[in-house]
């Protein structure tokens, strides 16, 4: 069965993000283009953000009637903070799947912190990635596992099988596999519990945003 327009609207931004991530990992620091691979994150803001803007009207889960209540938003923030707290402690060697695809150390050649790079990285992680990933992993993949006509699936009825399988695939896309299981299951649980993708997006954004601040404060660049 061919994928619907709604499916492609959720797949394309994610595919563009993964393509740029692979390019950043494959491009050596010294390359013929004279391009610093770390600045590919700026392309993410433009390319992936542009794709999300292009398809935005097709994302019904972000309509006004699907916004979370104050209580639901508070729950999402709490979940995001809990995931952050667990994520930074789930980094033992056995909790890793190989090495990160592309290391990100925002330091200049003379050892100074490169704040423009940090700003670009943080904005992408806290604003673009949560929307793009939740649209793909939860809105599309989790519901598609429940039924190929995923647009008709109420997230509250997606079921345990869809949660587990989508979280497993989510894990495969991350180096810290155990942390990814915790995060993926938490965001999926929020989506199923509230029926609102905004809650998963808020939690994801809180996790990524606070993680970025912590990374800069602690100098633990390996978490980026």
Language-model segments: residues:
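Transmembrane helix-loop-helix hairpins at the membrane interface
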Residues: 86, 113-224
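Juxtamembrane loop-transmembrane helix junctions in multi-pass integral membrane proteins
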Residues: 1-4, 32-35, 111-115, 195
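Transmembrane helix-loop junctions in multipass membrane proteins, especially transporters and channels
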Residues: 29-30, 57-61, 92-100, 174-175, ...
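Juxtamembrane helix-loop-helix connectors linking adjacent transmembrane helices
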Residues: 35, 61-132, 142-157
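Alpha-helical transmembrane segments in multi-pass membrane proteins
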Residues: 5-59, 66-80
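Alpha-helical transmembrane segments and their membrane-interface exit regions
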Residues: 47-54, 105-106, 185-197
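Structural signal for membrane-spanning alpha-helices in multi-pass inner-membrane proteins
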Residues: 21-25, 48-56, 83, 87-91, ...
């Amino acid at each position: 069965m061919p994928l619907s327009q709604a499916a492609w609207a959720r797949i394309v931004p994610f595919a563009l993000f993964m393509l740029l991530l692979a390019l950043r990992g494959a491009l050596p620091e010294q390359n013929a283009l004279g391009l610093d691979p770390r600045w590919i994150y700026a392309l993410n803001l433009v390319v992936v953000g542009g794709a999300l803007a292009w398809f935005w009207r097709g994302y019904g889960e972000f309509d006004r009637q699907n916004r979370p209540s104050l209580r639901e938003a508070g729950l999402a923030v709490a979940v995001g903070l809990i995931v952050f707290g667990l994520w930074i402690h789930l980094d033992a060697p056995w909790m890793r799947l190989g090495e990160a695809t592309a290391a990100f150390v925002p330091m200049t050649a003379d050892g100074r912190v490169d704040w423009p790079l940090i700003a670009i990285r943080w904005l992408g992680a806290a604003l673009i990635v949560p929307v793009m990933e939740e649209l793909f992993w939860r809105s599309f993949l989790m519901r598609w596992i429940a039924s190929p006509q995923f647009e008709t699936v109420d997230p509250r009825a997606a079921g345990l099988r869809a949660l587990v399988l989508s979280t497993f695939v989510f894990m495969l896309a991350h180096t810290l596999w155990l942390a990814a299981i915790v995060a993926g299951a938490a965001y999926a649980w929020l989506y199923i519990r509230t029926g609102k993708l905004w809650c998963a997006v808020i939690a994801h954004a809180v996790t990524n945003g606070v993680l970025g601040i912590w990374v800069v404060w602690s100098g633990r660049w390996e978490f980026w």
